[in-house]
A protein has these predicted regions:
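Bacterial N-terminal signal peptides that target proteins for export
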Residues: 1-8
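N-terminal leader/targeting segments and the immediate start of mature chains
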Residues: 19-89, 162, 234-246
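Non-transmembrane domains of secretory- and envelope-associated proteins
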Residues: 39-40, 46-50, 153-155, 194-254
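An acidic-aromatic
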Residues: 75, 81-144
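Extended beta-strand-rich segments in extracellular/periplasmic secretory proteins, especially
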Residues: 131-202
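Conserved "repeat-terminator" motif of extracellular CCP/Sushi domains
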Residues: 240, 318-330
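Surface-exposed interfaces of beta-sheet-rich extracellular modules
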Residues: 284-305
């Protein structure tokens, strides 16, 4: 792997972040002789770092990430970037897994727009293309990007401390799940005091056994930067999709989906179907996603089911698929 420079840089900034956050939980001493540090609440932090809000203020958002195990051995690093161009959210990511990860040494690249995203790994000759029909296409992409974590249900959060260091606010928060059998995590935020935007964040997972002994389970480190040029490290979409006038030896994929209004009996699209045609590289794994589970068929009469996990066969010259949300599949 050639990610050691990035790993070292992230580790150095993480050491500073963790040292600033200090304690793991609970006990923070207050020195009355010092100025009161600027305060920020979790609610303010989440609102300021809402991804849509960030895109209203910045051309791009870039996040680097590193995960280490309980022995502080790096398991992977990653980089993400997202932007909004003419009201369309675009994003890409690149994971670099080390030999210490569960998957072993590998690399994964991905690109996404509001209709689909493509992904491929160094260990697999075939790429994958996910086509989605969700109502909020922007949020679907943004959910793939690192963000300020929420507590979730059945969780209890404790503010461990808030201080200032080197012109930034440092906030430490511990989250315990009420039914987690001793598992919890501490999040340390480094925040720009002028904008309340995240600069760095660490998330450390712990486990406390029945005797009160605490062990670290692993740590994820994040670093945010803003307004860098948007540039994917690999154009995966171009490796998967081809123009309609392309002379490449590819598969012509036609897919049908119930058009809006067809559930009311309206004659919309082609007999109630909307139809799309794309050209994909041979062997591309095709996945269709919706807010509901889907059934796939090879014929208009819906008599020839396609196994959802086997997917559509794109090894030939053409392929056709009819996509039916299960609640509409009678």
């Amino acid at each position: 792997m050639k990610s050691w420079k990035r790993a070292v840089a992230v580790a150095l900034c993480a050491a500073s972040l963790l040292a600033g956050c200090g304690v793991q939980s609970g006990n923070v001493s207050n020195d009355d002789s010092t100025d009161e540090p600027q305060q920020i609440t979790i609610e303010q932090l989440r609102a300021a770092n809402d991804q849509r809000s960030l895109l209203e203020k910045h051309d791009t958002v870039t996040v680097t990430m590193q995960e280490s195990d309980q022995n502080d051995t790096v398991t992977y690093t990653a980089k993400f970037q997202y932007t909004c161009i003419v009201d369309e959210v675009l994003a890409w990511y690149h994971y670099q897994y080390t030999e210490n990860s569960d998957a072993g040494e590998d690399e994964v690249w991905g690109e996404a727009n509001e209709k689909m995203y493509a992904e491929r790994s160094a260990s697999d000759d075939a790429a994958s293309l996910s086509i989605h029909f969700r109502h909020d296409d922007k949020q679907y992409i943004l959910d793939m990007m690192p963000q300020c974590p929420t507590s979730g249900e059945n969780a209890e959060q404790t503010i461990d401390g808030c201080s200032e260091e080197n012109g930034a606010i440092l906030l430490s928060v511990t989250t315990r799940y009420l039914d987690s059998s001793g598992y919890y995590y501490t999040t340390c935020y480094r925040v720009d005091p002028a904008t309340s935007e995240l600069l760095e964040m660490s998330v450390t997972n712990y486990h406390e056994d029945e005797n009160g002994a605490v062990s670290k389970q692993g740590i994820r480190l994040y670093r945010w930067s803003y307004d860098e040029p948007y540039q994917a490290e690999r154009n995966v979409m171009n490796e998967v999709l081809f123009s309609t006038d392309s002379t490449e030896d590819v598969c012509d994929l036609t897919y049908f989906y119930p058009a809006p209004g067809s559930e009311k009996g309206w004659d919309v699209g082609e007999n109630g179907w909307s139809v799309s045609e794309i050209r994909v590289a041979h062997g591309t794994r095709i996945l269709f996603l919706d807010s509901a589970d889907l059934a796939l068929y090879a014929d208009r009469e819906l008599t020839k089911p396609i196994d959802f996990y086997d997917g559509v066969d794109t090894s030939g010259e053409s392929a056709t698929v009819y996509i039916v949300p299960l609640e509409k599949n009678h």
